[in-house]
Amino acid sequence: SAASDVYKRQMLTDNFGNPSSLHNLGINAMKQIILARGAIADSLGVDKDEIIFTSGATEANNMALFGAAKAKKRLGNRIVTTAIEHESVLESAKELEKQGFEVVFLEPDIHGNISEEQLFEAVNKNTILVSMMYINNEVGTVMPVKSVAKAVKRAGAPALVHIDCVQAYGKVNINPKKLGADLVSITAHKIHGPKGVGALYV
């Protein structure tokens, strides 16, 4: 859009300084980061200190999966996801599988749906992470993300819940706390923002 193009040009020409620097360019850049972090936090209904900027959706998803698995590995070994996640999630899950984690890839039906029953059956007391996208980027299926936290609680699992909201952000209302999500991935380019900018709610 015209508005986003103007803002992007402004960031490239006026606010390109190192935000860690003490000179004016750096200070101005830091102000923009603080404003952006606050805007994203407000859109999700979370605290600004819970937002980490990344280089995009892939890094946000990688960080969520590897970070959660390593943080919880003493409490269990099972990771539950679906077979139709974004490649950044699937490849991370496969790498964790090579490292010795038990990864369950839930298979969708012919319409691309994953049922709540599949989720409840897959999540057990040994589950340390459940990762699922909110809306599938290929077929548009709305996944049962609201049931993920319910499945974790029902199983008495120590699992963290990661929801990939990249395709959903800006289209549906997302509140990580209401979803019971510990980690949420989003990215700018899906809402007409610049490429190479993403965020992870932690």
Question: Could you say what each language-model-derived stretch is?
Answer:
Residues S1-V202:
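Pyridoxal 5′-phosphate
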